[in-house]
């Protein structure tokens, strides 16, 4: 068997985001063939992937992007069948807590039902891939004890947290019931230069830098 035949294949949802772009780089460095699912509306916000997308030795060779939506099971299933990944990293979804109060149905459709759709699809594949779901500390709401762990009760206080709690528990159920290799990673706030500027921590950092440079006088 050649080295090319041994190459692992991974599929990333949410690849245009902070974590997805870093994960794509990591997997490529490890020798993976990396496929990413992007929304049509993400076509103008791929700056985190520009260095990969513009490299002819990477894009189309070891790195591929596919248009699909978590709300569109037909297209999503076609991508899964075509790519036949060994590993799926599910990072996509509506991830803004404040916005989830304004668009709760969309938040639940993408974050909760979208995860369920993926689980249903992969359990029907001849060789179900390993599945990782990026959960969130928002599933715990306002816990009385610090720090939390896997046994901390779910008590979300916003639509995003509720959607993530549903998705997280469905991963557990599908692992126990159908024997899938499916796991959750409970994510807390984490920062990088690639984090979206609409998050409060990025706003604070940018304002602090602007104050230092004399471009503004106070945090905005």
Segments predicted by a language model, with ranges:
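Sparse recognition of residues in long alpha-helices and their boundaries
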Residues: 116, 219-220
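Glycine/proline-rich active-site loop of Rossmann-fold NAD(P)-dependent oxidoreductases
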Residues: 165, 190-206, 212-218
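Generic recognition of well-ordered alpha-helical segments
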Residues: 170-173, 203, 207
């Amino acid at each position: 068997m050649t080295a090319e035949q041994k190459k692992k294949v991974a599929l990333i949802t949410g690849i245009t985001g902070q974590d997805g772009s870093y994960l794509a780089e990591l997997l490529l460095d490890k020798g993976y063939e990396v496929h990413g699912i992007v929304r049509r509306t993400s076509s103008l916000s791929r700056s985190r992937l520009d260095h990969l997308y513009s490299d002819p030795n990477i894009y189309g060779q070891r790195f591929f992007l596919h248009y699909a939506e978590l709300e569109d099971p037909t297209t999503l299933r076609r991508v899964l069948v075509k790519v036949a990944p060994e590993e799926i990293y599910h990072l996509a979804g509506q991830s803004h807590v404040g916005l989830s109060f304004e668009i709760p149905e969309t938040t639940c459709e993408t974050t909760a039902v979208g995860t369920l759709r993926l689980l249903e699809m992969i359990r029907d594949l001849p060789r179900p891939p390993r599945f990782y779901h990026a959960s969130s500390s928002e599933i715990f709401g306002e816990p009385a004890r610090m720090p939390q762990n896997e046994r901390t009760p779910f008590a979300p206080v916003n639509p995003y947290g509720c959607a993530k709690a549903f998705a997280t528990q469905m991963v557990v159920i599908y692992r126990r019931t159908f024997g899938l290799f499916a796991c959750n990673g409970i994510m807390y706030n984490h920062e990088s230069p690639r984090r979206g500027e609409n998050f409060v921590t990025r706003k604070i950092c940018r304002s602090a830098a602007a104050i230092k440079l004399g471009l503004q006088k106070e945090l905005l």
